[in-house]
């Protein structure tokens, strides 16, 4: 495993397992499989409605809590000082732990300033080791970073070979904030798994397109959280630490950046309205 140092000095694994849209009934088994495979970063969220299953899997694994990097996120319907604090305490209860390693604001809507104050308090109290945001683009990230006491350690964004977030990464570098990649395999879009460049580079190293895409991110210091419910896929995704992409291959992959800031427009009112209306 390789590690990435955050702007507060703590280290996180460069590769993790994400549980977005993993059925709570199946999630415990999936997280158990991931931990058995070797994953030590687990990414969940209140909105995923599977924190309890994640907590069960971690408790039953027998792995020391300090050896697992646990991430969760506060949903926008729980935004604001009071509701975010209450919901975070509930998340800790479900996860069966007295702290998480990284706590994020899930969406750039609602009273996320109140939520962030709750997170700063949780950081001071040792209930999280780092704090950050998710899906915050340039304007909202910059405004937030200018008006908080603790700048975000992470901004979790849709990031992959086709959406490389070069503009956001430049902005985030000013505060030492790291991009964390959700959708690191583009959710299979744009022929990711069969893309001729990914496949050709993979053939050179004896790797799959998925492994090349993940290695591309990790090699740039971008932690990634691929999701699968298949243990063989988990093993495949995890097997990216025995090769290094050369400069020529990195240049070829950099040229695949088709929609730099991702496939979702958070400034589009219809899309924003759909996000704001979502509950769990």
What are these model-predicted stretches?
Residues 1-68, 185-186, 280:
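N-terminal binding-site loop/beta-alpha segment at the start of enzyme catalytic domains
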Residues 23-34, 80-94, 141:
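Short, acidic/polar
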Residues 39, 97-100, 128, 152:
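A structural motif
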């Amino acid at each position: 495993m390789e590690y990435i140092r955050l702007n507060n000095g703590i280290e996180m694994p460069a590769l993790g397992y994400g549980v977005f849209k993993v059925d709570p009934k199946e999630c415990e088994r999936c997280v158990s499989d991931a931990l058995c495979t070797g994953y030590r970063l687990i990414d969940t969220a209140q909105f995923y409605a599977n924190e309890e299953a994640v907590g069960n899997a971690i408790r039953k694994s027998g792995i020391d809590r300090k050896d697992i990097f646990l991430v969760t996120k506060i949903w926008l319907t729980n935004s604001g000082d009071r509701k975010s604090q209450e919901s975070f305490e509930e998340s800790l209860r479900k996860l069966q732990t007295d702290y998480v390693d990284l706590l994020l604001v899930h969406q750039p809507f609602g009273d996320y300033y109140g939520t962030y104050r709750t997170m700063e308090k949780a950081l001071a109290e040792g209930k999280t080791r780092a704090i950050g945001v998710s899906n915050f683009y340039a304007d909202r990230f910059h405004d937030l970073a200018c008006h908080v006491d603790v700048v975000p350690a992470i901004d979790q964004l849709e990031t992959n070979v086709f959406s490389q977030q070069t503009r956001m990464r430049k902005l985030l570098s000013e505060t030492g904030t790291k991009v964390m990649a959700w959708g690191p395999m583009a959710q299979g879009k744009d022929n990711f798994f069969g893309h001729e460049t990914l496949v050709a580079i993979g053939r050179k190293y004896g790797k799959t397109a998925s492994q090349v895409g993940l290695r591309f991110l990790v090699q740039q210091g971008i932690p990634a959280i691929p999701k699968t419910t298949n243990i063989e896929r988990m093993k495949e995704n995890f097997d990216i630490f025995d090769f290094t992409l050369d400069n020529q291959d990195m240049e070829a992959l950099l040229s695949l950046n088709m929609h730099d800031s991702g496939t979702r427009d958070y400034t589009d009112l219809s899309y924003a309205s759909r996000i704001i209306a979502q509950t769990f």
